[in-house]
Amino acid sequence: MGSVLGLCSVASWIPCLCGSAPCLLCRCCPSGNNSTVTRLIYALFLLVGVCVACVMLIPGMEEQLNKIPGFCENEKGVVPCNILVGYKAVYRLCFGLAMFYLLLSLLMIKVKSSSDPRAAVHNGFWFFKFATAVAIIIGAFFIPEGTFTTVWFYVGMAGAFCFILIQLVLLIDFAHSWNESWVEKMEEGNSRCWYAALLSATALNYLLSLVAIILFFVYYTHPASCSENKAFISVNMLLCIGASVMSILPKIQESQPRSGLLQSSVITIYTMYLTWSAMTNEPETNCNPSLLSIIGFNTTRPVPKDGQSVQWWHPQGIIGLVLFLLCVFYSSIRTSNNSQVNKLTLTSDESTLIEDGNGRSDGSLDDGEGVHRAVDNERDGVTYSYSFFHFMLFLASLYIMMTLTNWYRYEPSREMKSQWTAVWVKISSSWIGIVLYVWTLVAPLVLTNRDFD
């Protein structure tokens, strides 16, 4: 009897595998909008891919992957073969994820509302989509080696560079929303408390940035060497100071009342992270000490004969993963009315659509059990670009690939090495990020005939 009830329970979920997103989540989650629930499911699927990629880097798993016929054939380089298998596995897994999201991005071009037949593919058919993704990933493991790893390294580097810039755009949006929320609460009541909170958050960000700069000069520079690191730290410090001063100039405040030091402090600490991440990719080990050596621990990891070592975990990579998760989930739930950011991310003003959706009672709600319902708030128009959202996840897959492999490149000499290319990609992205932030400050002054509200 129990088995029959169990089968009936499982059977009740079968329509959900081919139906809309709310059917999957609304049985265990509160009521919500279809647009938000769908994005969360895609983000959770990407998170599962990240977890699998992390598992593939575990030495025990690498030994199992090494049993795949021909996967690590004729690899007799300096770096152990099982390490190469781990990095290759991440490349192929992320290749499959990236191709899955790129395919959806191309399929969803110019979808205007949920009444478009392609919107049903975006918001439903989950079983078939996930099965397709798994099939693409499995197929990626049978791609002949050849130049695949080298070519995909450069593709991943370009995609990761673009995703870093998207991270910065979302970070600017988050900082603006954060500042606006606290300023509104400060004006409504208990102004001293909220003013102190705003000031404390700003001061903490700048304090952490200052501590980071001091540590960079202490551990990543030497009096007679490491001139590149000295230049990176100094230039980024001056750029952050300039952007912070610019954000509180009277002319900027007049045209951009929402600008302030809180946003600048968030951009500053993110720039310091990019600077640190870039310096940790330098090939010269004397200018790139490991975190364990900095804090005084002696490592006992095996080192090959030529001294080329491979570390399985990287602190800057862990921080990068945390930022990645925050970015993806924030982009999945954000309902910001910041018009500048919405234009950059091809997002509509969601508030009006939500209000319209909440006002409907006939056919607008996906009935669930009890009060668990989801609003189809995209019948009159999508609240975000389906195509751009999938393209962002495509770039996120490449960013994860580069982060988990620490931006290492597989050399023809069969060594896993850091590259100056990765250093310059990260440093240039930090510079472009500051330029983008400064542009959000000065754009209303330069383009006076345009509305930036």
From Swiss-Prot:
InterPro entries: TDE1/TMS
Domain of life where this protein originates: Eukaryota
Alphabetical keyword list: Endoplasmic reticulum, Lipid biosynthesis, Lipid metabolism, Lipoprotein, Membrane, Myristate, Phospholipid biosynthesis, Phospholipid metabolism, Phosphoprotein, Transmembrane, Transmembrane helix
Covalently lipidated residues, kind N-myristoyl glycine: G2
Phosphothreonine found at: T352
Primary site of residence: endoplasmic reticulum
Protein name in UniProt: Serine incorporator 1
Organism: Rattus norvegicus (Rat)
